[in-house]
Amino acid sequence: MERAAAGPLGMEMPIMHDGDRYELVKEIGSGNFGVARLMRNRASGDLVAVKYIDRGEKIDENVQREIINHRSLRHPNIIRFKEVILTPTHLAIVMEYASGGELFERICSAGRFSEDEARFFFQQLISGVSYCHSMQVCHRDLKLENTLLDGSTAPRLKICDFGYSKSSVLHSQPKSTVGTPAYIAPEVLLKKEYDGKIADVWSCGVTLYVMLVGAYPFEDPEDPKNFRKTIQKILGVQYSIPDYVHISPECRDLITRIFVGNPASRITMPEIKNHPWFMKNIPADLMDDGMVSNQYEEPDQPMQNMNEIMQILAEATIPAAGTSGINQFLTDSLDLDDDMEDMDSDLDLDIESSGEIVYAM
């Protein structure tokens, strides 16, 4: 199974970092956002993940939103935000390191999960997303690549990447078309406001389906790169569970109630948490959201207050000296605006012609 979306890698560029506090261990990833490195805190020895983003125009609203929203979240199923550091060339976002890698890679290795294993991870995903919603934050880009695992024997799932998250406290209702095509809810593709929390439910359903089946529900397996066909199938809620995948009636019922085109009729997060399939063998620490969040009140509060962070972000919008034009990434050859306009005329649907579906790593 291929990733739902992948962006091109950037050019190599030296990255300066806070040598007084962290030391480099190794590179752990790169994408449209920049470069990610595994670092070690010199004082404590703790490992952290650091995401480096070029100073200047890349420090946009999405980056600022990611940091502000992520900082407000404290839950065992969400990657911990630690601090931001301004280097001469980059903004560095320091986060908890999840040594188990992506849930995506685990599924690729296994092919697909048993129903019990899928439920084990789905329960944790719902616990984390439900907490986000209780904090008035909708993620808007939930996918396997944005769910990491710690290194324990029974892995704890960790949600990451809040670049497209939206807070109903700080922002208006979502309207822009963002996310990864395979996971996007039908209403997100339409030119109107939508409930980001209900759209997150759909994306959680796609994650559950992929864990059980080992394929995306709305992709054509013979033409997986045809994003227009994927979008058509999403809008028509056209999916099926293969005959070779044997799941319980309760599991099938939950999937059917998630994949509902009308968001007003779709199962809600509280209803999922009370669904018989979800409740089966649920760990005690996931039973009560209040208990979960209270247990996670760690002594290491964020190192920076919001004023410090906003000042760093403001400075980060100023490009590094002499780096103009360096480390620019190639854009995907797919012209999404034209594609959406074509679909508008082909399908007689009111599609957001300026929709910003983003294929991020």
Curated annotation (Swiss-Prot):
EC number(s) per entry: 2.7.11.1
Nucleotide-binding found in the keyword field: yes
Residues that bind ATP: 28-36, 51
Signal peptide residues on this chain, from the entry's feature table: none
Keyword tRNA-binding: no
Residues annotated as domain Protein kinase: 22-278
UniProt KW keywords: Abscisic acid signaling pathway, ATP-binding, Cytoplasm, Kinase, Nucleotide-binding, Nucleus, Phosphoprotein, Serine/threonine-protein kinase, Transferase
Location of the active site: 141 (proton acceptor)
Induction: Down-regulated by ABA in roots. Induced during incompatible interaction with the bacterial pathogen Xanthomonas oryzae pv. oryzicola.
Tissue expression pattern: Expressed in leaf sheaths and roots. Expressed in shoots of young seedlings.
GO CC field: cytoplasm; nucleus
Catalytic reaction list: L-seryl-[protein] + ATP = O-phospho-L-seryl-[protein] + ADP + H(+); L-threonyl-[protein] + ATP = O-phospho-L-threonyl-[protein] + ADP + H(+)
CDD domains in alphabetical order: STKc_SnRK2
Enzyme class: transferase
Primary localisation category: cytoplasm
SUPFAM superfamilies: Protein kinase-like (PK-like)
Subcellular location(s) of the protein: Cytoplasm; Nucleus
Pfam families: Pkinase
PTM description: May be phosphorylated.
Subunit details: Interacts with BZIP46.
Family: Belongs to the protein kinase superfamily. Ser/Thr protein kinase family.
Protein name in the entry: Serine/threonine-protein kinase SAPK9
Species for this entry: Oryza sativa subsp. japonica (Rice)
